[in-house]
Amino acid sequence: RKSRNDVAVIGNEVYIGAGAKIIGPVKIGDKVTVGANSVVTHDIVSNSVVAGIPAKYLEVNE
């Protein structure tokens, strides 16, 4: 049986590009852009842009 700890938590105003995959119980902050075909395997801080396999930070806005 799955618990709520086994799912991804996605913040507000998040854009997830086509084909992107979110793997595991990660937390994605608010106002994040995930590039197309990216694979997210770790938590992403708010106000950032990530892309790649695995997803890496391209930009972090304060």
Where are these regions (language model features)?
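Conserved catalytic-core motifs of eukaryotic protein kinase domains, centered on the activation segment
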Residues: R1-K2, V26, N61
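Surface-exposed loop/turn and secondary-structure junction residues enriched for glycine/proline
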Residues: N47, V60-N61
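Left-handed beta-helix
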Residues: D6, G11-N12, G17-G24, G29-D30, ...
